[in-house]
Amino acid sequence: LGDVYKRQICNIPHPSYKEEKISNYLVDFAKERKLEYYQDSLNNVIIIKEASKGYEDAAPIILQGHMDMVCEKTPDCDKNMDEDGLDLEVNGDFISAKGTTLGGDDGIAVAYALAILDDDSIAHPRLEFVCTVSEEVGMEGASSIDVSMLKGKKLLNMDSEEEGIMLASCAGGCSSRVTLK
């Protein structure tokens, strides 16, 4: 997992509204493994891996994350977050970025999903990875993605706030328009 995240995802700039490169990386990942995939005009991606032998009748599982990251940097950092990959520091099991945010929200979900989809030794039902764009700026990708091809009824949102904590729900958003007279 660390290798996928460290070497590939962090090398691809993926701020909100500029997810095309990471989206295309996900499509290439699916193509290389002969997995079914969908990419829409906003660059949302769905990757489907059919069930392994013996799990064909098991209920499909939807894995969900988002591909954009919050791009912040220290005042002395001259990195162009729209164009440059991250400079990583690895200290044992810990990965951090030099002078910038790491993009762990939600790069870790993307890395986990890719590691799961890439591992043929894991027995599994049909897996459906839904990876949306522009979550950090209002869940825009999630609001407009066509999920009609999904068969799963259970979704595992992998965008949690704390390491080592499994969340039995997910963050949500709501907007209202109020007119006062």
Which stretches of residues belong to each language-model region?
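Short, small-residue-biased leader/transition segments that mark boundaries at the very start
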Residues: 1-5
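Acidic/His- and Gly-rich active-site-bordering loop/insert found
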Residues: 6-93
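Generic secondary-structure signature for well-ordered alpha-helical cores
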Residues: 7, 11-15, 31-36, 118-125, ...
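Alpha-helical scaffold segments in soluble metabolic enzymes
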Residues: 8, 25, 112-115, 144, ...
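Flexible, glycine/proline-enriched loop segments at strand-loop-helix junctions
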Residues: 12, 16, 96-105, 165-166
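A generic local structural motif
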Residues: 33, 48-50, 116, 141-144
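Histidine/acidic-residue-rich, glycine-tolerant segments that coordinate divalent metal ions
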Residues: 47, 124-181
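Active-site metal-coordination/substrate-binding segment of hydrolases
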Residues: 55-126, 131, 136-137, 143-153
